[in-house]
């Protein structure tokens, strides 16, 4: 009897946060395009570098996510809670779209079901 060795390669997805961050970066730097008279996609602003096959492009601009829009299903951001100290997506400056925000402090009391 003989022996053989096997190697198995596993494909594994990257961490969800990393994938989301990469997509957001691509989205933020996507190139605006339009159709020319021949039906070919051309850049709206030729001052920028032409998009590569790895870049995102768009024809129609994204809706304003700050404002409620029933046709797109966007609820907007008005009335949502934000984090005053965060510079991320949950931060008040970004989430409130420059409209300002109300500050308040709250105390929450919860039963912890602790046993001593």
Curated annotation (Swiss-Prot):
One of its GO terms (biological process) is neuron differentiation. It comes from the Eukaryota. PANTHER family: PROTEIN WNT-5A, WNT RELATED. One of its GO terms (molecular function) is cytokine activity. It comes from Anser caerulescens. The keyword Glycoprotein applies. A lipid is attached at residue 1 (O-palmitoleoyl serine). This is Protein Wnt-5a.
